Amino acid sequence: MTPKYPEKITFAHLPTPLEEMQRLGKHLGGPRLFIKRDDQTGLAFGGNKTRKLEFLVAEAREQSAETLISGGAMQSNHCRQTAAAAARFGFECTLVLTGELPDKPSANLLLDELFGAKIVAVPDRKDRDRILQEIFDTAVAEGKKPYLVPYGGSSPTGALGYAFAMEELMRQKPYEGSEPSQGCPDWIIFGTSSGGTHAG
């Protein structure tokens, strides 16, 4: 029996390239090193959150949500991509960001604003969860239909993006000419924060 996965909206530029870092491998004495270029997923300058958002935005649509609410650091890549997805698919967007708003927005914060996101600055990180929930509850009380995008897009739904990324990686067969059993990497190393990539 084939498992049934939740729907997703396809907007990432996939598959992302798998590039060998030959000079670095040579410098380190011979291991073959590859980098999976998920900086090239395409949404708002790319990044790994796009894979998660394909599933999360589909879930928000399925629930007839009107606004996406999420949070993170003041220069969060996740929030930048959430704001971009909201703009692309017609959602309102509220972002609860930790830190003080600068006089002049730049980098991701500037992009958040260009994508039309409403920014709520929270000076102390320990207050962020409470304020995020208050914004969500207020939207519900006003008769709106909010969808809470978890930090980093990390939830069982969002993690599916990286379950499928592993399938994609295995199909790319980086070790040309090797036996199928030898075609998998010995190690996979990545930066992590909210755990969704690990879970996938």
Where are these regions (language model features)?
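PLP-dependent amino-acid enzyme catalytic core
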Residues: 1-200
